[in-house]
Design a protein with these regions (language model features):
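Conserved active-site tyrosine of GNAT-family acetyltransferases
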Residues: 17, 111-112, 116
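Conserved acetyl-CoA-binding loop-helix of GNAT-fold acetyltransferases
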Residues: 75-88, 113
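A short, internal acetyl-CoA/4′-phosphopantetheine-binding micro-motif in the GNAT/acyltransferase core
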Residues: 67-74
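Short hydrophobic/aromatic beta-strand element in the GNAT-like acyltransferase core
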Residues: 37-41, 52, 66, 132
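Conserved catalytic-core motifs of GNAT/GCN5-like acyltransferases
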Residues: 99-101, 117-134
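A conserved beta-strand-loop-helix scaffold within acyl/acetyltransferase catalytic domains
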Residues: 31-32, 44-46, 53-62, 67
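Conserved GNAT acetyl-CoA-binding A-motif
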Residues: 90-103
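Conserved N-terminal entry element of GNAT/NAT acetyltransferase domains
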Residues: 1-9, 137
Length: 139
């Protein structure tokens, strides 16, 4: 056996590792219910993105990976429309729950307003004095 370390993980190394991990996980999970991106985007009349949400289905869960709203339209309901639409699509695809994480300077109050509840807060992440919050919602 040989142990190596690198700062430059190659696509091939990543794929080799993930192939092994997926094979192991397949013993316990229905991988057909994993994957499948959900993308919801709001654009202006010129096609410029005003906001968007990208999530992925993982079993019975919608994992919200990214949510962004342009500063000029924050507070106008765009974020709420994005998340509501993603939740509806996730329900249609069989999801029963949603999970999102956010850092203290981001959008915890927004998610709580949408019905999400904090399950855990990781202190001093990514830096001293900040927190990473994990929130869930029953769909």
């Amino acid at each position: 056996m040989h142990l190596s370390i690198t700062d430059n993980v190659t696509a091939e190394e990543k794929e080799e590792l993930l192939t092994g991990l997926r094979a192991y996980n397949a013993q316990f999970l229905d991988l057909a219910t994993f994957g499948g991106d959900i993308g919801v985007y709001m654009r202006d009349d010129n096609g410029v993105m005003l906001g968007g949400l990208i999530g992925v289905r993982k079993g019975d869960w919608l994992n919200i990976d990214y949510l962004w709203v342009r500063d000029s339209v924050r507070g106008t309901g765009v974020g709420s429309q994005l998340i509501k639409t993603a939740e509806e699509e996730a329900r249609r695809k069989g999801c029963r729950h949603a999970l999102v994480d956010t850092v203290s300077f981001q959008a915890r109050p927004f998610y709580e307003k949408q019905g999400y509840q904090v399950q855990m807060s990781l202190q001093d992440y990514p830096y001293q004095g900040m927190q990473r919050h994990y929130l869930t919602k029953h769909l």
